[in-house]
Amino acid sequence: MKVNAKSDHKLLPKVTKVVAKGDAKGKKVNKAWLHDHINDPYVKQARKEGYRARAAFKLKEMDETLGLIKPGDCVVDLGSTPGAWSQYVRRKLSPTGAAVGALNGRIIGLDLLPMEPIEGVVFIQGDFREPEVLAKLEQALSTEKGPVKVDLVISDMAPNLSGIESADAARIAHLVELAVEFAQTRMKPDGALVVKLFHGSGYDDLVKLFQASFKVVKRMKPKASRPNSSETFLVGRGLKNVTPV
C-alpha cells in the first residue's frame, strides 16, 4: 500500500541545472540533497543495473545476510510502487537472475498508486484491507490445489512525516501493525516479514510487537540506508500465532 512518495525511491535523471523554490537556505538544502542523491553510489548502481530505485540494495543486503528468498517462494510486496523491491525479488527467483524469462516462484505487489509493469509480477492496485482487493489477492494466490500461503511479506511502506513526533509515530506504527496483521493471516507459519520503520517515539513498542508475533526478530540497518536517516528495518521469522483467514 503506497502511502506516500518514498524519499529515495524514484531515481532522478541527470540534472544540469537546479532550480529550487523557497528562500536561500531552502535552496542550499535542496541543492545539497540533490547533489548527494545524484552522486550516491547506490543511485548510480541502481541506474546501471536497471532498478527503479536504490531501495533495491536494501532488500538485497538483508536477503544476502538472512537468506530470505528461496527458489519457489511466494512473495508479497506491500507498498510495492515504484517496484524496486519487486524487481529484486523477480531477479532472485529467476533461475538465471534475469529480469525477464523463466520465474521459479510467485510475486504479488500491492499499492494504492499505480506501478509500471514488471514481467512475472502480479500487481494489484488498491487498499489491501478492502474486500475487492482481497478478492484479487485470493485469485493471485490460487492454484489447482487451492490457495497458497505466502513465504515472505516485504513492506517498504512509509507515511509522509510531518515533523510532529507523536503524529509521525502513530502513522508509522499503524503501517507496521497492518503489515504484521497481513502476515499473520496470509503467511506460512515458518515465513518471514520485513518492514521499514524509524527510530524515535514508539520504536521500542514496535520491536515488542514483533517479538510477541515472531519467534526470531532481527534489527537491520542496510548500508544502502542513508547514514543520517533514522530509517531501519525489522525482520520477523516464524509466526508465534497464526490467524486464520
Curated annotation (Swiss-Prot):
Residues at the active site: 196
> What is the disulfide pattern of this chain?
none
What is the name of this protein?
A: Ribosomal RNA large subunit methyltransferase E
Q: Which residues bind S-adenosyl-L-methionine?
A: 83, 85, 111, 127, 156
For this chain, the family text in UniProt reads: Belongs to the class I-like SAM-binding methyltransferase superfamily. RNA methyltransferase RlmE family.
Q: Which InterPro entries match?
A: RNA_methyltr_RlmE, RNA_MeTrfase_FtsJ_dom, rRNA-MeTfrase_E, SAM-dependent_MTases_sf
Q: Name one GO cellular component term.
A: cytoplasm
> Where does the protein principally reside?
cytoplasm
Q: What is the species of this protein?
A: Polaromonas naphthalenivorans (strain CJ2)
Report keywords, A-Z: Cytoplasm, Methyltransferase, rRNA processing, S-adenosyl-L-methionine, Transferase
Query: Which enzyme class, named as a word?
Result: transferase
